[in-house]
């Protein structure tokens, strides 16, 4: 998918990886970039507008834990303005295994609910034009950081959901792929809580090993968007973009 002249909704587009990805996206010249985030950041929005004045950058406050009906209401406003949306990026995430319910609500349920809401406008069975979903998951969905099992499991769930979305594309007209960053130097990683405090230094220990910058991750994210491969499981790690081949251990045969 060429980003130029497209309409993109980016959930959590002002976070660590999110903001650098938003910067790279506006450089590529979409028609509209609509950012949905829990916390407004007027300085960041102004910066994005300045990077490419031809791009219309819009912000709406959004909490991914709201009911689906609330998200549909917000999307109605956005679709009324844009008429069409080409790409939805689900990027909301927290890393704090003290907050068990919220971790699941943000990292998994929020992704499911936001995707479910946009189906009201995209699903070809409802007369929709289809669309593309890019879900930010994590390499911990492949193999857990076992000291944060709740976070890791929430990302594995989001990855499984995304893989199913891709398989449903012939029915819905909506394609999907996952973005799975490795350890990236963001405020999220510097200090966070392990489950039951099994390892108080888990963030510090991770940063003792090779990592990547948010810019490296963002640049590869844009490459994945441009590749636009339904069902792709993209690993964005150590500055590289790798297509992961998923090993099938079981099949429902339906």
Curated annotation (Swiss-Prot):
Give the InterPro entries listed for this entry.
ADH_Drosophila-type (IPR002425), NAD(P)-bd_dom_sf (IPR036291), Sc_DH/Rdtase_CS (IPR020904), SDR_fam (IPR002347)
Residues annotated for NAD(+) binding in this entry: 10-33
* Gene Ontology cellular component list: cytoplasm
* Reaction equations catalysed: a primary alcohol + NAD(+) = an aldehyde + NADH + H(+); a secondary alcohol + NAD(+) = a ketone + NADH + H(+)
Please state what class of enzyme this protein is.
Answer: oxidoreductase
Name the Gene3D superfamilies on file: NAD(P)-binding Rossmann-like Domain
Top-level taxon of the source organism? Eukaryota
Q: Name one GO molecular function term.
A: alcohol dehydrogenase (NAD+) activity
Instruction: Write one Pfam family the protein is assigned to.
Output: adh_short
Catalytic residue positions: 151 (proton acceptor)
Q: Which residues bind substrate?
A: 138
Q: Which BP terms does GO give this entry? A: alcohol metabolic process
Q: Which CDD domains match?
A: ADH_SDR_c_like
- The EC number on file is 1.1.1.1
Question: Which UniProt key words apply to this protein?
Answer: NAD, Oxidoreductase
According to the UniProt entry, where is the signal peptide?
A: none
The entry sums up its family as follows: Belongs to the short-chain dehydrogenases/reductases (SDR) family.
Q: How does it assemble?
A: Homodimer.
Its recorded name reads Alcohol dehydrogenase 1
Query: What is the gene called?
Result: Adh1
């Amino acid at each position: 998918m060429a980003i130029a002249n497209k309409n993109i909704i980016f959930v959590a587009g002002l976070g660590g990886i999110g903001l650098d990805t938003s910067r790279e996206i506006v450089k590529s010249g979409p028609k509209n970039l609509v950012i949905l985030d829990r916390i407004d950041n007027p300085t960041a929005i102004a910066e994005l507008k300045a990077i490419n004045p031809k791009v219309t950058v819009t912000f709406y406050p959004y909490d991914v834990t709201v009911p689906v009906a609330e998200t549909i209401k917000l999307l109605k406003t956005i679709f009324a303005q844009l008429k069409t949306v080409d790409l939805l990026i689900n990027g909301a995430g927290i890393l704090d295994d003290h907050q068990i319910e919220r971790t699941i609500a943000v990292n998994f349920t929020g992704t499911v609910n936001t995707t479910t809401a946009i189906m009201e406008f995209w699903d070809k069975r409802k007369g929709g034009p289809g669309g593309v979903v890019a879900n930010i998951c994590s390499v911990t969905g492949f193999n857990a950081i076992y000291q944060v099992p709740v976070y890791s499991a929430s990302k594995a769930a989001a990855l499984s959901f995304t893989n199913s979305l891709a398989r449903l594309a012939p029915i819905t007209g909506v394609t999907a792929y996952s973005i799975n960053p490795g350890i990236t130097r963001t405020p999220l990683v510097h200090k966070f809580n392990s489950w039951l405090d099994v390892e108080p230094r888990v963030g510090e220990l991770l940063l003792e090993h090779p990592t990547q910058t948010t810019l490296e991750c963002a640049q590869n994210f844009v490459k994945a968007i441009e590749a636009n491969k339904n069902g792709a499981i993209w690993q964005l790690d150590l500055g590289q973009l790798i297509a992961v081949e998923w090993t099938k251990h079981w099949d429902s045969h339906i």
